[in-house]
Amino acid sequence: MEQEQDTPWTQSTEHINTRKRENGQQIQRLEHPNSTRLMDHYLRTMSQVGTHRQIVS
């Protein structure tokens, strides 16, 4: 049951999410020492991901 990532559907979904969040993820890594900015961006990213998941579902 741990092989979810190996299924085509999961891979394609993960790929879409990665494409959408790619810029955000890069910003998070670059600005990691800046806690305030990191948290602000993290909250925004999570909101977008939550909305996206509802649409996909």
Swiss-Prot record:
InterPro entries: Flu_proapoptotic_PB1-F2. The keyword GTP-binding does not apply. It comes from the Viruses. Its main location: host cell. It holds the Pfam family PB1-F2. Is not encoded in all strains, and seems to be dispensable for replication. Belongs to the influenza viruses PB1-F2 family. This is Protein PB1-F2. The gene is PB1.
